């Protein structure tokens, strides 16, 4: 008996950042003069809505079809990234919102519910909106000369594939 291994991709749903936001956040991060961690390339800035993990490539079209049925808010989502935090367990330096809009929380939940039928073995994690600035970060929260105050606006979400250190 031969086992057929279908190629898999590590995928996640996310809101992308505009080029202008990427540039502003990248310049602000540079002002922090980080001495530890690996900065996330600004081209990879995003806000993950739901991480699916390893998925058979054959299921991607079906996953996209299920996600396309999710109602998105009539107005673009606006999220204020105004807090700088260190997440010790994941060793990440992140920007987070003090208050996440209810529409964003509902969108993440709707995606999670829509993906249940695909039987992904994903451990349930509470959705914590964030933009990762650096990985392998092992220090305290750096002092910012100018406090973070960035507006992420999005009117759609997408399915992204992750590679080691990259997103496509």
Language model features: what each stretch is:
Residues 1-168:
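Histidine-dependent nucleotide/RNA phosphoesterase domain, centered on the 2H-phosphoesterase fold
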């Amino acid at each position: 008996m031969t086992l057929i291994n279908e190629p898999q991709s590590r995928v996640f749903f996310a809101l992308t950042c505009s080029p202008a936001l990427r540039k502003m956040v990248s310049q602000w991060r540079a002002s922090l003069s980080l001495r530890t961690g690996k900065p996330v390339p600004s081209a990879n800035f995003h806000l993950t809505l739901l991480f699916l993990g390893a998925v058979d490539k054959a299921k991607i079209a079906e996953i996209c079809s299920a996600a396309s049925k999710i109602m998105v808010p009539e107005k673009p989502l606006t999220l204020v990234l105004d807090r700088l935090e260190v997440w010790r367990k994941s060793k990440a330096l992140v920007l987070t919102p003090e208050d996440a809009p209810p529409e964003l929380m509902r969108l993440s939940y709707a995606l999670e519910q829509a993906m249940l039928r695909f039987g992904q073995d994903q451990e349930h994690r509470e959705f914590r909106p964030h933009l990762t600035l650096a990985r392998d970060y092992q220090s305290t929260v750096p002092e910012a000369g100018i406090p973070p105050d960035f507006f992420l606006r999005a009117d759609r979400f997408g399915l992204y594939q992750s590679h080691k250190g990259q997103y496509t």
